[in-house]
Structure formats: C-alpha cells, structure tokens
C-alpha cells in the first residue's frame, strides 16, 4: 500500500504540494487536462521551474493567472458544484471536496457565519482551485492510500490579507490546527510558513500528524516555496509503501459489560444510561427479561472501548443496584467512517460517510442536526433530512 508523508520543516502551501507531486513524477500535462474539466482552462497556466533553495534543488510550481481581476468570489456550495460537475477521478473529487469543506468550516468559524455563506476571497480564486484540486489529483495519480504529516512550524510576524494585517499563524490556520489537533512548534522564523490552503490540504487529508510511519521509502519529491528563509524553503514529500491492511475489513476490540436488574425504577435506569455514555460507552441498551421468581427485569448491556472500561464499570456500580457484572472482550468489524459537514438550505448538517475497501456503502445525515434545524425553521424533520440526504448523495454517491 502506498503512503505519503508531508515533511514540512519550512511549512506548507498549496504550490509547494503541487511542486512536490510534480517532482515525484506526476505528469504536468495530466494535471492540466484534468484541471481543464473545472472549466477554468482559459484562466490559468501551470508551469514548473527547477530552483535552488539554500543550495538544495527543488521544483517550483507556479500558477499564472490570465485575468487577475475577473474572478468573482465563490461560496462553498458553488465550489462543490463545480468540482462535482468536472467528472474527476472519484478519489480526487472526494478529497478536493473534503479540503474545501474543511476550509469553509474554518473560515466560517473565524468570521462567525455558516460555512456555506463564506466568501472565498483567496480560496475561491483560480490559483487555489488549481493548488487544491491539483494536489488531490496528484495523490490519486500516485495511488496514495494513506497520508501523514509532520508537526507544523507556526511562523510569526504579520501578513497582509483582504481584511488588513493579520498575525501569523492567520486565524483560519489556527482554527484548522485546533480542529484537527495538529502538533505545532516554533522554528524561530518570523514569516508566514503555513498558508490556509496548505493547512487545509494536510489537515483534511492526513490520517495522523507527527513522526513518519514505518515505511519502505521509495522516493522523495521536493516542492519549493517562494520566500527566502534561513533554511531550505522546501516541502519534502516522502512516498513509500507499507503492508496492506487485511481484506476482511477493519477490526476493533471492544469490551462487553452486562448485568441483570429487577429492582430499579425506570427513571434511575435512564439516568444511568446517560452517565454510561458520558463515561465513554459506545452503546448502551436494555432488554426486557424474566428473572427468578418470575420477576420482570432488564438486561443492561454496555459496549465500550478498553480505554473506557474502568469508567463504565465504576458508573454501573455507582448508578445502578447491581452487585456484580459479567465481562467479555470481543472483536468487531466496522466500516471506515468519516464525519463530514454539508451546507443545506436550512443550515449545516453533519453526515456520516461509511466505506469498505474503497467502496462507499452508506451516507447518513445526523439525526440531531436535522432535528435542531427542523425546530429552528418549523419544518417537518423528514423535509430537512431528505434535503440533507440529497446534498450528501450528490457529493458522495454510493458505490
């Protein structure tokens, strides 16, 4: 299985990602032909140049805009429609949507508005579309199955933006790093090292941050940045292989705790279930049973990860009348799942997207989000749910 590791000693930006992928062998004409499907072929030219950064070779990717003043601001739903209509390779399309989605949510949080209302000043521009979609196309071309990233340098100072001078890291980058729990450090360089586009790419696509995973290294692509820095301004993209995961699916270990109760009022049992979820239980369910002396009771079953077992045991003893518990460790198979956010006419809805061996099998809007929006807009729950499901299936069709 092919994996990629973004090694970012000098930070990360969209053009650096593109340069590193082109340096790894992604054909320039392939990217240009695929990007033309976005309907922007007449608006840009993508070129490369071999450059030196502190004595080290790197490949500089440059997006030359043919009209710097003719691009209107775009919203996230417009960008999603543009990408979906382009008939890109499935994984490249999905990754591109995921990156723009992450950026829309971050920008919305910074400005205090819904993601679908964000004006993409820089991100909606053609150069950023090329950087983001081009990077996703390159990773797909190299058949990368898993992406990892190093800790990111914070940079420092200020940078000029559409709203004036901003401190570095800029707010959108900080929001992304906070949401995705990215490890940060300072290398003492007082410049912008991580751009919003670069942060969105590594945050949305990476399975983890920190040290590189164990891999057999095949080659390294070097993407050059624009600024002159005290260290080589290069993104180092490692390409390697790891053993493929089992074909039978994703296995997870869980602990099952059970107890039978016949002397608890239902109100107390309801509260106990709430406390079990708060303690880290994955699932809690109660089944009616007949106990000794023909007394009616309930069988309480708790499923939890091993890390939450002690807390769930303590909660059962504290909140129920049980004098003992049964325990067994089980293996379960689960689909690969991702929680995504989508814009709808009623507001943002979280959607659970489930896959198995690269095939998308299930897409489900979250009940609570639909219920909250139904109450807010005084609409039937089904109306909100069906609207969210239609948007989700358009972005992530099954199969």
Swiss-Prot record:
This protein's source sits in the domain of life called: Bacteria
What's this protein's family per the entry?
Answer: Belongs to the LarC family.
- Identify a single GO molecular function assigned to this protein: nickel cation binding
User: Which Pfam families does the protein's record reference?
Assistant: Ni_insertion
Q: Does the keyword GTP-binding apply?
A: no
PANTHER family, sorted: NICKEL INSERTION PROTEIN-RELATED (PTHR36566), PYRIDINIUM-3,5-BISTHIOCARBOXYLIC ACID MONONUCLEOTIDE NICKEL INSERTION PROTEIN (PTHR36566:SF1)
The record's keywords, sorted A to Z, are: Nickel
Q: Has the keyword Transmembrane been applied to this entry?
A: no
- Could you identify this protein by its name? Putative nickel insertion protein
């Amino acid at each position: 299985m092919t994996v990629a590791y973004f090694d970012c000693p000098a930070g990360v930006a969209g053009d650096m990602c593109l340069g590193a992928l082109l340096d790894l062998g992604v054909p320039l004409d392939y990217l240009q032909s695929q990007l033309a499907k976005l309907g922007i072929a007449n608006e840009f030219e993508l070129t490369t140049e071999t450059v030196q950064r502190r004595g080290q070779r790197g490949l500089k990717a440059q997006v030359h805009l043919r009209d710097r003043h003719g691009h209107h601001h775009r919203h996230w739903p417009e960008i999603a429609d543009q990408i979906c209509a382009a008939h890109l390779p499935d994984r490249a399309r999905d990754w591109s949507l995921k990156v723009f989605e992450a950026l829309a949510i971050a920008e919305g949080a910074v400005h205090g508005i819904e993601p679908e209302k964000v004006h993409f000043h820089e991100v909606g521009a053609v150069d950023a579309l090329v950087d983001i979609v081009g990077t996703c196309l390159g990773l797909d071309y190299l058949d990368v199955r898993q992406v990892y990233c190093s800790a990111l340098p914070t940079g420092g100072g200020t940078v000029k933006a559409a709203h004036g001078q901003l401190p570095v890291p800029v707010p959108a980058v900080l929001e992304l790093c906070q949401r995705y729990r990215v490890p940060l450090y300072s290398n003492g360089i007082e410049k912008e090292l991580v751009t919003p586009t670069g942060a969105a790419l590594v945050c949305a696509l990476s399975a983890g941050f920190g040290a590189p995973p164990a891999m057999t290294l095949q080659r390294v692509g070097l993407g050059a940045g624009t600024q002159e820095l005290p260290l080589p301004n290069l993104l180092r993209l490692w390409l390697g292989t790891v053993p493929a995961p089992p074909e039978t699916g994703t296995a997870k270990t869980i602990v099952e705790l059970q107890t039978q109760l016949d002397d608890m009022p239902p109100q107390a049992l309801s509260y106990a279930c709430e406390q079990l979820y708060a303690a880290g239980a994955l699932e809690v369910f109660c089944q009616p049973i007949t106990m000794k002396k023909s007394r009616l009771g309930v069988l309480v079953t708790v499923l939890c990860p091993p890390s939450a077992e002690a807390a769930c045991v303590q909660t059962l003893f504290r909140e129920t009348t049980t004098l003992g518990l049964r325990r067994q460790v089980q293996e379960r198979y689960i689909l690969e799942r991702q929680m995504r956010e989508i814009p709808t006419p009623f507001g943002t809805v979280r959607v659970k997207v489930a896959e198995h061996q690269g095939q998308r099998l299930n897409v489900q809007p979250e009940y609570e989000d639909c219920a909250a929006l139904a109450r807010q807009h005084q609409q039937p729950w089904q109306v909100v749910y069906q609207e969210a499901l239609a948007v989700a299936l358009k972005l992530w069709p099954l199969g």
